[in-house]
Amino acid sequence: MTAPEFVPLGEPYDPGCPPAEAAEAFHGILARRRSVRFFSDREVPREAVEAIVRCATTAPSGANKQPWRFVAVSDPELKSAIRAAAEKEERELYAHRASEEWLKDLEPLGTDDVKEYLEVAPWLIVVFRMTATDDGGKTYYSDESVGLATGMLLAAAQMAGLSTLTHTPSPMRFLAELLGRPKHERAYMLIPLGYPAEDCTVPIHAISRKPLEEVLLFDPKP
């Protein structure tokens, strides 16, 4: 067995203020993020997409296999094809697949099977989870790893002043087909990326967050 090699950590990031203060400042940015369904067609440069995805790729992953692939789509014809396929699946969802409880939970959000934003947003970022490496090797904890990377992508987009939406049409096999992806890449999430429309609105129901004392426990006893 080959002994692992190590290097010095390097100079840790110093926010220049106490940890709680730095975290609160970051929270102030993230807390303004909204899932946007009304986008402007205002151009977003390719360099911005590259920088945002580069942030996502800093996520930790099982055995550092980095089991993700990000496909950026701006071509109008391809976006139109993705919208048509996504809406087909969504019609099935709302008409047959979703339970009554699910549909009732969606009512306050005002969602439906019309996904105009898939054509209006300047970019669609399709996140793929790799079930194997490109050379046929194993990946580990790929769901968790890609989930972490996706969250970091959303945070980076917010830091860049751009809006996003996490869209998961089910099933998503059509994305691999339309984008020519190999069998070991599974569509994980479809993320429109861009500026919000000037008259963009968001559902009140989506703004509230559980209080910290409900989601954070310190040293709980059985």
Predicted regions and their residues:
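N-terminal accessory segments that position/regulate proteins before the catalytic core
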Residues: 1-36, 40-50
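Short alpha-helical scaffolding segments that buttress acidic/His motifs in well-ordered protein cores
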Residues: 30, 52-56, 191
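Small-aliphatic-rich amphipathic alpha-helix that forms the alpha element of a beta-alpha
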Residues: 52-56, 125, 130-178
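Glycine-rich, charged/polar anion/phosphate-binding loops
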Residues: 54-57, 108-112, 175-177, 200-201
